[in-house]
């Protein structure tokens, strides 16, 4: 039973597996990032929601690859994250988590919303700028 695995060496993915094709390697990396997203984002999102008093408002946390959004919060309490965000620095991931969880309190981008975001994630402008500058590098 040959095992598939992903190693990261010097910011490079090293994919190990039996009879690897480009498509198979891509699938291995996608599953790796999805699993990493679940392990990293879910506890942080639920912890922040608990801190903000909105943990009961989360009905689900989902992960999917989207073309234009890094995250989304529905009016029904579903938090959705693009698992490609796991290729960003942890500080940027934490900003995205904060942004979507704060929508559970404010379903808009009002002054109240941004004040709340800044209270749990200071310097959020820096992370927004990072995403604007580097987001094209995170897609594959």
Predicted regions and their residues:
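Walker B catalytic acidic pair
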Residues: 100
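Active-site-proximal or metal-binding-adjacent scaffold patches in catalytic folds
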Residues: 1-95, 104-140
């Amino acid at each position: 039973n040959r095992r598939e695995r992903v190693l990261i060496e010097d910011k490079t993915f090293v994919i190990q597996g039996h009879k690897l094709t480009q498509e198979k390697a891509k699938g291995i990396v996608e599953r790796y990032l999805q699993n990493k997203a679940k392990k990293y984002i879910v506890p942080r999102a639920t912890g922040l929601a608990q801190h903000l008093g909105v943990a009961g408002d989360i009905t689900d946390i989902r992960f999917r690859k989207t073309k234009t959004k890094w995250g989304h919060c529905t009016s029904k309490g579903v938090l959705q994250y693009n698992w490609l965000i796991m290729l960003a620095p942890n500080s940027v991931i934490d900003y995205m988590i904060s942004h979507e969880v704060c929508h559970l309190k404010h379903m808009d981008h009002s002054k109240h919303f941004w004040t709340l975001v800044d209270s749990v994630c200071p310097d959020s402008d820096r992370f927004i700028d990072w995403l604007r500058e580097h987001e094209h590098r995170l897609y594959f």
